[in-house]
Amino acid sequence: FGSKLREEKAQGIEMMLTVDVSNSMLAEDFEPNRLERTKYAIGKLFEGLQQDRVGLVVFAGDPKVQLPITSDYRMARAFARRIDPSLVSVQGTAIGKALEQALLAFSGDTEQSHGRVIILITDGENHDDDAIAVAERAAQMGVKIFTIGIGTPEGAPMQIGGEFIKDEAGEMVVSKLNEEMLARIADITGGAYVRSSKQSIGLDEIVKAINEMEQTELSTVRFEEFNEQYQYLLIAALVLLLLEFVVLDRRNPLLAHLNIFREK
């Protein structure tokens, strides 16, 4: 009785969502802005999962593992709601570093990479590194990268604390979607690129493609609760105690005069 750990095995996919939290994701060409729309879509994705594992990497100039690989979707939704630019101290958009971190964040044997995908959500404005080289390495490992471009080619200004971000000349900075690199990353790894629209961020299309992939065996350790059985043990103990009194009543002359178990 009580609880114990129980290992469950199921077929599924490991998905590492890699989310851009740089200032450019605050652009308002999506309502209320790119990042808030992304967070909402991720939360809806987690609500519909059953046997897959998920993790979260957030990035700007540097990446950070926000949520290690897990099958606890309630916890995953809670972490998704907390996605914010303040999670990363260095601004910029280093997509290559983020993909590298996502590859390292998968669980278990890195040599067995089928059934593992990275979903990269960004506006594609890569400033700091060579994301293509990391994509080529992911392809060699058998990890597919699905990319979602959020933003518009025309772009939009960004606000922080109600103030528009401006360049050194005092002009408002406009963040535009860079699709070329995102499409190339997906193509190199055998994934797919989707451009977000006002109606859908694109996760539904990505998940449909992922569901057609070869799955892998995933082990999950869970706490298993049992019904308390102490009442039955208590009854058995009382029966044994009564039997002991019967024996004592018959054999012990000091108890015989009490006549507890004798008819008068």
Located regions from the model:
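VWA/integrin I-like adhesion module and closely mimicked acidic/polar interface patches used
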Residues: 89-93, 104, 114-117, 122-188
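Hydrophobic/aromatic beta-strand patches that form the interior of the parallel beta-sheet core
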Residues: 16, 57, 119, 146-148, ...
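Extracytoplasmic/secreted cell-surface and envelope-processing proteins
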Residues: 26-28, 64-67, 126-131, 155-158, ...
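C-terminal signal-anchor/stop-transfer transmembrane helix together with its immediate cytosolic
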Residues: 1-8, 212-264
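Short, hinge-like loop/turn segments at secondary-structure boundaries
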Residues: 72-75, 163-166, 211-214
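Membrane-embedded segments
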Residues: 1-116
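Sec/Tat-exported extracytoplasmic proteins
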Residues: 46-53, 80-87, 102-110, 122-128, ...
